[in-house]
Amino acid sequence: MAGKGEGPAIGIDLGTTYSCVGVWQHDRVEIIANDQGNRTTPSYVGFTDTERLIGDAAKNQVAMNPINTVFDAKRLIGRRFSDPSVQSDIKLWPFKVIPGPGDKPMIVVTYKGEEKQFAAEEISSMVLTKMKEIAEAYLGTTIKNAVVTVPAYFNDSQRQATKDAGVIAGLNVMRIINEPTAAAIAYGLDKKASSAGEKNVLIFDLGGGTFDVSLLTIEEGIFEVKATAGDTHLGGEDFDNRMVNHFVQEFKRKNKKDISGNPRALRRLRTACERAKRTLSSTAQTTIEIDSLYEGIDFYSTITRARFEELNMDLFRKCMEPVEKCLRDAKMDKSSVHDVVLVGGSTRIPKVQQLLQDFFNGKELCKSINPDEAVAYGAAVQAAILSGEGNEKVQDLLLLDVTPLSLGLETAGGGMTVLIPRNTTIPTKKEQVFSTYSDNQPGVLIQVYEGERARTKDNNLLGKFELSGIPPAPRGVPQITVCFDIDANGILNVSAEDKTTGQKNKITITNDKGRLSKEEIERMVQEAEKYKSEDEELKKKVEAKNALENYAYNMRNTIKDDKINSQLSAADKKRIEDAIDEAIKWLDNNQLAEADEFEDKMKELESICNPIIAKMYQGGAGGATMDEDGPSVGGSAGSQTGAGPKIEEVD
């Protein structure tokens, strides 16, 4: 159970391009809208000279500030800088990415006039913090516990890094769950009334940056994943890129100018392409109109749905490969699939739907769940189950997920010996006995890999450790038991033990290369707190400034009102007008003042205006003299060189 006073547990779909948050409330899931009224929030963080923006505010200013607005952190998280996919992305991103220690990609931005470096985990943690705050604003309580989703095809380091992002955001990540599995819960609860018996369901999840296919068997509230496949680097953004390149070429042809080096022009073009792509899902052609795109040249063009499909045809076809692989792995024929469920915004593309439908021999696709919200919905249900908040409808749901990649270790000659084959249900534990390769070998090096190839050099090294202190013996005699243990988050622990001596060593595979250390995470948590308090400071400042501005303009309108105007003496009226003019002029010149300066100015202005207005309301001459005596300290001082509030503050 979640501790009391922590508020309910929430489910967060941390997406490449958009994120979404849900909570279990009143026996159902509520998907929570942000302060702009949107139920999904852009996974964007913008840095300016004065503030840090997250979500809609960041995405809205991206054209003005492309190099300091970070998005796509999910395409970096848990990857190395030298990863080919990172290298190809860097060519397309307007912000700067450099290699940090241990080949870890670091994002470089200018914030408040100084250069700052952030890891992908930190950017993701800012988005998670935003989602947490959206939920807190709606629920009116603080929130500590969350279930966060990742693509099913995320590997160990990507999962671990996502968990770290949660820690930096001050969340207790109760569980990392796979996006298609979360969507399957949404589907299962949606269909629960009508279904009897076992159902085979294929979840086709094509989002902004990642692609997953999972095949599940759902029966009586048990969700068993049979197989999963996917591409952690394929999604709507790749379709946008194709369209952007298409128009860059067209601009070159028409105007003999290359805009590809201009981040602002590219960003405006990308925004227009994103909009055009969405429009083409419902109409056959659309226009792109961008005024003064580059060197004062207006860009007007049209694109048809057919052309868009042609630009992306290879990518769309690529989406079918994991579907085949998934069915093969599950040893299931496509005719045995009862329902094909669409998840993720990119599944709205008609061509993707058509290819999928053709693959399943014309079968109707299931579109009954909201593709943008299904994942957060499922995560919220899982959060309710784990914290014991759900009702009996969900408490008996059981999720049996699988590990997406085979796990094993390197044996003599660089071969990969698999201990846990891919699509094994997790949590799981496997042991195997190994021995030494040469006589009197004092230790063994255990190197853990994930991947499907026969040679370890073609797979991904997760980590390694040494088991030493083996007593001298001929080769093949010592018995070393190696145990692989995967928890429910899909994160691996490996231990090795020498049977004769009882020597033990173990490692939690947390990708030594890219993994943040405890100290780094601590530091990032503190920095996150610092940024948060800076954001709050700024908010206070803006509120104080607005309060002063409102007061001044309202007062100006008040004294213009005929009823009031007629009751004020000319001298009083002039005093108020002068004070207001002075305050407004001060405001114009001191936009960047601190909150307390705005507050002081406000007090000063009030000390002049309020007594006069109060005197007017009392109206009687007798009252007036009393009144003038009363606040004269503040009043008279206030009119001289702004010393007013200083006197007030003494008491």
Swiss-Prot record:
InterPro entries: ATPase_NBD (IPR043129), Heat_shock_70_CS (IPR018181), HSP70_C_sf (IPR029048), HSP70_peptide-bd_sf (IPR029047), Hsp_70_fam (IPR013126). Coiled coil: none annotated. Induction: By cadmium. One of its GO terms (molecular function) is ATP-dependent protein folding chaperone. Keywords: ATP-binding, Nucleotide-binding, Stress response. Residues 619-651 are annotated as: Disordered. Belongs to the heat shock protein 70 family. This is Heat shock cognate 70 kDa protein.
